[in-house]
Amino acid sequence: MYWRKKKIFILISLLLICVCLFSGYYLKITIQKANSYSMSTKAFLYLQKALNIMEKKFIYKDTIDWDSIKKEVYKKAEGSVLTSDTYPAIQLARSLIKENHGFFASPSQMELLEKEEFRFEPPIYRLLEKNVAYLSLFTFPSTSDEADQAYNKQVQTAIRALDSSNVDKWIIDLRKNQGGNMWAMLLGLGPLLDKECIGFFIRNNGEKIPWKHKKNTVKQGNSCCLKSSLPPYQLKNTPKIAVLIGNNTASSGEAVAVAFSGQKNVRFFGQHTSGFANATYPFFLSDGACLLLPVMHFSNRLGQIFYTNMAPDEVINANEATNSLKDPTIEAAIDWLCNF
């Protein structure tokens, strides 16, 4: 027993010595690299961390020549002493990898974002000709659970009011929806969604994470994202739905469109969406700065992945959404709802 304990002690000691030697070697190499760009070790490690996050997590990471990118970015950061001195280099990296959905924000910018009170337009709804229900959802930059619940209540109040007219034909207008909190939007629209699984996030390794709507709750996988404070509501009639999309339908607005994609009795009208059909995730750096990156693609319930934008079933050449009966996209939607 004594020799066994001694052997274990010797092995642990050797392991610790190896770790110390490796750490010392790594530190020496890091200092050499930092010196080669006339950077402080702190600034170099900070920039290295940001680049490593991009290389490992960015949704299009496998299409990028990272050695070339890093060479140019480190050159941009030459002379950096403080972590903040590397910010222009991080922005350059975002530009070089063509990252245009997320952002990089300094600690002071993050403080302003957290304090900013976002205002959002409530949904517009009304009954159109031929007993067609019209519901338009705008951008919803959620800031709290309280705001999410208020938004969900507004959307469901609109749906219940329209459904009281015994409608079975619906127009969901997403042409002015540039994103925000997809879960609040999907929760509000729950009565119009016909399946529990309404879409997926797709990781770079192919892993699928389902979007679920059930019993007035929306989930990402098995994790609850938002639960309604209202009782569940069921439509009086099986809905036939026209979804309107366009160039300003972006991010979470595209997620809502994807949730309806593949549902029976649904057709899309308008123009191609913005092309931000992916999920973003915030990565916080050591000084409090935030690197927001797109990390997962959207897929509809049938497994169709949207790598860029989403195309309508019927392209309508109209400039912008007008929310009026003279709107060619609304006219086309009404024609399909009532005649096909």
Language-model features and meaning:
Residues 180-240, 278-282, 295-299, 305-306:
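Gly/Ser/Thr-rich loop/hinge elements
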Residues 46, 60-130:
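Extended, small/polar residue-biased N-terminal targeting/export presequences
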Residues 158, 162-179, 239, 243-244:
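Short acidic catalytic loops
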Residues 50, 93, 135, 172, ...:
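Terminal peptide-recognition signature
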Residues 18-36:
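Membrane-interface motif at the C-terminal end of an N-terminal transmembrane signal
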